[in-house]
């Protein structure tokens, strides 16, 4: 699973996910990308499930770029534990994804294969997504 090697603070507040992404809204590395149409948390397990489904679809051809990383710790208190006595233990890691962010990119394969791989990856995610194509400067492919 993806997780940071070390962090400055072990626990974070939850915060809110509002607004559009500031960067990473275009496909930069590959030819096709999977763009988030909603804001949400994406867990490390969901990212790994997407990666595996894309790798199995591509079958040793093409390249995959993962543009999100789970760097936010999520805590929870044990079942049957009363409130108080401090914040719970870290249970997992999530990536904060805002609307408009390109999360995954694929390159080096034909259009049909890339779209099929990204559709499989999208089915593993809890948010609405859109498959986008890379455009060169000037609007041409």
UniProtKB/Swiss-Prot annotation:
Part of the 50S ribosomal subunit. GO terms for biological process: translation. It comes from the Bacteria. NCBIfam families: rplP_bact. This is Large ribosomal subunit protein uL16. Belongs to the universal ribosomal protein uL16 family. Binds 23S rRNA and is also seen to make contacts with the A and possibly P site tRNAs. GO terms for cellular component: cytosolic large ribosomal subunit. GO terms for molecular function: rRNA binding; structural constituent of ribosome; tRNA binding. InterPro entries: Ribosomal_uL16, Ribosomal_uL16_bact-type, Ribosomal_uL16_dom, Ribosomal_uL16_sf. The keyword Hydrolase does not apply.
